[in-house]
């Protein structure tokens, strides 16, 4: 597959950002997150089949850029740059926007997509227009038009101020503006998360390592895509349950992947090591049920579940450990970290995380989920996306990282799993795993 870049430009907000909003102060929780770009690719079929493909591409290209400019007026920090550890310069420099053409039809690509080919659709950093400090850009976008007129929208969003829900809210606003381009669209009002968790310059610069430890690229790793359909999830949840509890989709899938990853590591390394699983818990619904989608920034905390030789590795046992740790991050847990006095509690909990990660002989796995966040509800006027994926980047640093997404139907789960090469060789042939999921299934075949 060949991808040819046609143009590169900056899309600026259609209305200038007021002087009093030129500096966006990030929250205390944002301070804990590295400014890494997280890419997601949305694939849309060409639904305008009665119109010549060149005309479809020209029209789509124009309206996407115009509606993006309108949307950025409300999401003004996204058109700026990360200034320093505690602020974003909302300078209206604009979103770096690339347009390209793909030599294939989209259906050909989706028949058997692979991570390396998908990464060709991400915004490249080689252009002179893309400065050397590319990680300082808050958002970069590439629109890749296939031979059939279908389009892949690749959006790289800086995790520094954008978590999964913030990202999806932005995309929905852009899509809604595109659908009603001739109308006056009102984007959601955003309450900055800094008002909930005030920033503090005294936070140690190495605090990021307490949230994301030992996940750096220290060896060769590979990524595989795993699909659980609805019926398999029903069976898996039943197997992972006990007389005292019934797991959620996230708990059952995470527990199974964790169990099989532990087994794969034991087989490839010839020894049984302690295992630590970190997971994220979204705060929004717990603190602001009515406006939870409209709070911008990182509003989550990392929890930790641990397993060792003496704790057992049965599926229902691992799932119960995970459930118990998730339940600890409740409304009281969150409220203690809010306000002016929350800084001390955050520092205290960072130390607890550091202690959980002290065992350098343990295997660490990081789980993150955007299930139930509405990733397939982003409709630009062409219907639901044919497929949504997170391909990572060519210079991704993370290993032992697992992302969970909804399938297009909403009742399945797609898992993107990155493991050490030797562990993956064992993991992908685990019969217990294969009883519930399939590897590298074509998105065209997924419900």
Enumerate the predicted regions with their spans:
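Detector for long, low-complexity, acidic/polar
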Residues: 24-25, 29
